[in-house]
Amino acid sequence: MKKLSFQQIILALQNYWQDYGCAILQPYDAHVGAGTFHPATVLRCLGSKPWSVAYVQPSRRPGDSRYGMHPNRMQHYYQFQVILKPSPDNIQELYLKSLECLGIDLKKHDIRFVEDDWESPTLGAAGLGWEVWCNGMEVSQFTYMQQIGGIECRPVAGEITYGLERLALYIQGVDEVKELDWNGQIGEKALKYGEVDFEAERQFSKYNLELANSKMLLRHFKDSEEECKRLVDGDVPLAAYDECLKASHTFNQLNALGVISVTERASYILRVRHLAKICCMKWLELSGE
């Protein structure tokens, strides 16, 4: 199997899906917990207009902070997201061919689709789904997006999310993310993943778990919540959705700090879900659907 570097994996996926006909978008410039939170998925999966895109999305999950000491769990990581709307009949075949373009021989490796229906409580999103396992390691999530913001997706969109670090661990045959070959160079130009990202991993873990100001974050959440509602009323759902994302990330920070009780957690999830819903409803209203 050809051992692509981390950046070569990204380039190969971009080229593959570009050749299929996807527009290659850029990462969204906000703190999100997954590629699904990009407005190119949340808002564009709604409505009847066709939409085929692919993009890398840096993602943050404060609760996964491990100071860079865990072999494959980080508070900051990368996903590659593909949205095909309407979902083509051969989407599974397209996905498997994308693995082949990464040098994975499907005849020599055990590729399994393990049923795992997907749900995002904060987005009010859900769909039939499968985890994709390669020789026992999860490398992707495959979902038929049926609902976002509590609104049915018509037509249903196909979503493929590649876990880039896990995929790279398998392709390169290494055990720790920090040891991944980032750029495929040798000698002085060679870079490992750890040299690029792990000092930030250490510092942000300390911030997420030790230094974050919970009182300030509680104010930030309330401010983002109020601003989101105000902007929806002002007919700018894209700007409002940014505030929804801020509220969602702030909730994740508070959760990582352990300052939210079980009961409060459920309440916060409902509040963020409401923000996502009103953004989605306003987006559809302005789209004439």
Swiss-Prot record:
Subcellular location: Cytoplasm
GO cellular component, one term: cytosol
A Pfam family: tRNA-synt_2e
Reactions this protein catalyses: tRNA(Gly) + glycine + ATP = glycyl-tRNA(Gly) + AMP + diphosphate
Protein name: Glycine--tRNA ligase alpha subunit
Group of enzyme by EC: ligase
EC identifiers of the protein: 6.1.1.14
Subunit structure, interactors included: Tetramer of two alpha and two beta subunits.
Organism taxonomic ancestry: Bacteria, Pseudomonadati, Pseudomonadota, Alphaproteobacteria, Rickettsiales
GO terms of molecular function: ATP binding; glycine-tRNA ligase activity
Family, per entry: Belongs to the class-II aminoacyl-tRNA synthetase family.
Highest taxon in the source lineage: Bacteria
Major subcellular location class: cytoplasm
